[in-house]
C-alpha cells in the first residue's frame, strides 16, 4: 500500500499516441490524483504527533512506539466506514463532515480497550475523482485525527471507472492504537454494582442511516428544507452532524484509574453493544428515564412509526458511549468527564444476570414517549 494517496487501477498504456488509448481515455486521471496529493499534504502534516511525522510520499508509514512513550505496548486495530450516511452527503453536496465520522467510528472502538489512537489511514474509492470533493473529505479526516490525537499517515484513492455511479464515492478507515499491557481493559474488570454512565451523543452518529433515509423519503422533505427538529439548520446538515469523538475524555478517565470498561454504542444500539463488554453472568440494568431523548430521535420515531425497542436496537438514542465505573468513584468520574466537555448521565448499574437478558432498560416506552 502506498503511503501517499495513490490512483489504483489496472494498467493501461498512458503513453499511447495518435489513435491509441490513454489512461485518461479509460477514465483514470493521474494529474487529478497528483493534484489531490498536493492539496492534502498540509492536512496530513497538521496531524503530526510524537512517534509519527505524518508526511506523505513513502511506500509505508513508520511509527516509533518508544518515541510515543510506550514500554510494553499492545497494539489495537480497528476498521470501519460511514455507511449510507454518505448518501446524504452525496445528495446534498455536503462533504466536509463525513471524514470526521470515519475517524470517529474507528478510534472510539480503540478506546473501548483502553487504546490510545496513534495513526490513521483512509481508503477513498470513486469512479471519477473530483479533487474539491475528495479534498473536503480528507479535510474532515484530518480534523477527526486532530480531535483523536492520532496522525494521518497515508491512504489510498482508488479511481475505478464503472465501479460506482458517476459522482459517488465510498470510504473506509483504518486505525492503530496502543495500550500498555497492564492497562488493557478487559471484561473481567467490570463487576456487580458498577455504575453505568452515559456520554451524550452529538446526534445520530454513523449508523442506522438506511432507516433514516427511508423515513426522510416518507416525510417528503428535501435535504435543503429546515430540519423539523432543528429549524435553524437544514435537514441534511442536521443529520450530517459528525459523530462525537470520545477519545481524550475516555483516556483521561482511564489514566486516572476511574473506569472498568467502555461500550461504544453503534449499530445494534444498547442491546448489541453493551453485552460485548460484560463478563459472564452480568447484565446492564438501565433506567430509560435517566437521560433525555434528543429531538432528532423523537422526529425519526414519530415520522417513521418506529417502536421504542426498535429505536434502541438501531440508534444510539442520545448516548454514544457507556462507561462502567466503580460505585465509590462514580462522582469523581462524572466530574472528570465533565471537565473534558462531556455531558454525562447516570444510566444504571451492573447486576447479576440470572436467566434474563444481558441488557434491561426500565421505562423504555415511557421514556421515549415523553
From Swiss-Prot:
GO terms for molecular function: ATP binding; phosphoribosylamine-glycine ligase activity; phosphoribosylformylglycinamidine cyclo-ligase activity. Its main location: cytoplasm. Signal peptide: none annotated. This is Phosphoribosylformylglycinamidine cyclo-ligase. Pathway: Purine metabolism; IMP biosynthesis via de novo pathway; 5-amino-1-(5-phospho-D-ribosyl)imidazole from N(2)-formyl-N(1)-(5-phospho-D-ribosyl)glycinamide: step 2/2. It catalyses: 2-formamido-N(1)-(5-O-phospho-beta-D-ribosyl)acetamidine + ATP = 5-amino-1-(5-phospho-beta-D-ribosyl)imidazole + ADP + phosphate + H(+). It is an enzyme of class 6 (ligase). One of its GO terms (biological process) is 'de novo' IMP biosynthetic process. It is found in: Cytoplasm.
Amino acid at each position: 500500500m502506498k503511503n501517499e494517496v495513490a490512483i489504483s487501477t489496472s494498467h493501461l498504456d498512458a503513453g499511447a499516441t495518435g489513435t491509441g488509448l490513454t489512461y485518461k481515455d479509460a477514465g483514470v486521471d493521474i494529474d487529478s490524483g497528483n493534484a489531490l496529493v498536493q492539496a492534502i499534504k498540509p492536512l496530513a502534516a497538521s496531524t503530526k504527533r510524537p512517534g509519527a511525522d505524518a508526511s506523505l510520499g513513502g511506500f509505508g508509514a513508520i511509527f516509533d512506539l518508544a518515541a510515543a512513550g510506550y514500554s510494553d505496548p499492545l497494539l489495537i486495530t480497528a476498521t470501519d466506514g460511514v455507511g449510507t450516511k454518505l448518501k446524504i452527503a452525496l445528495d446534498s453536496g455536503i462533504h466536509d463532515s463525513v471524514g470526521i465520522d470515519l475517524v470517529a467510528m474507528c478510534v472510539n472502538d480503540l478506546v473501548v480497550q483502553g487504546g490510545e489512537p496513534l495513526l490513521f489511514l483512509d481508503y477513498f474509492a470513486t469512479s471519477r475523482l473530483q479533487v474539491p470533493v475528495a479534498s473536503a473529505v480528507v479535510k474532515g479526516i484530518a480534523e477527526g485525527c486532530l480531535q483523536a490525537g492520532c496522525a494521518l499517515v497515508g491512504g489510498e484513492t482508488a479511481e475505478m471507472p464503472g465501479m460506482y455511479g458517476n459522482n459517488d464515492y465510498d470510504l473506509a478507515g483504518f486505525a492503530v492504537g496502543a495500550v500498555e499491557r497492564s492497562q488493557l481493559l478487559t471484561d473481567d474488570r467490570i463487576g456487580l454494582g458498577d455504575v453505568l454512565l452515559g456520554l451524550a451523543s452529538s446526534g445520530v452518529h454513523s449508523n442506522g442511516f438506511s432507516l433514516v433515509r427511508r423515513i426522510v423519503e416518507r416525510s417528503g422533505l428535501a435535504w435543503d428544507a429546515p430540519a423539523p427538529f432543528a429549524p435553524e439548520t437544514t435537514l441534511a446538515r442536521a443529520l450530517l452532524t459528525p459523530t462525537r469523538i470520545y477519545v481524550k475524555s475516555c483516556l483521561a478517565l482511564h489514566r486516572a484509574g476511574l473506569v472498568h470498561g467502555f461500550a461504544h454504542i453503534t449499530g445494534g444500539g444498547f442491546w448489541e453493544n453493551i453485552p460485548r463488554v460484560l463478563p459472564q453472568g452480568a447484565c446492564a440494568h438501565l433506567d430509560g428515564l435517566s437521560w433525555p431523548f434528543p429531538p432528532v430521535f423523537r422526529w425519526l420515531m414519530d415520522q417513521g412509526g418506529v417502536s421504542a425497542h426498535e429505536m434502541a436496537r438501531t440508534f444510539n438514542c442520545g448516548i454514544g458511549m457507556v462507561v462502567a465505573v466503580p460505585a465509590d468513584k462514580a462522582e469523581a468520574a462524572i466530574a472528570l468527564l465533565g471537565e473534558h466537555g462531556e455531558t454525562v448521565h447516570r444510566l444504571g448499574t451492573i447486576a447479576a444476570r440470572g436467566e434474563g437478558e444481558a441488557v434491561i432498560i426500565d421505562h423504555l416506552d415511557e421514556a421515549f414517549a415523553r
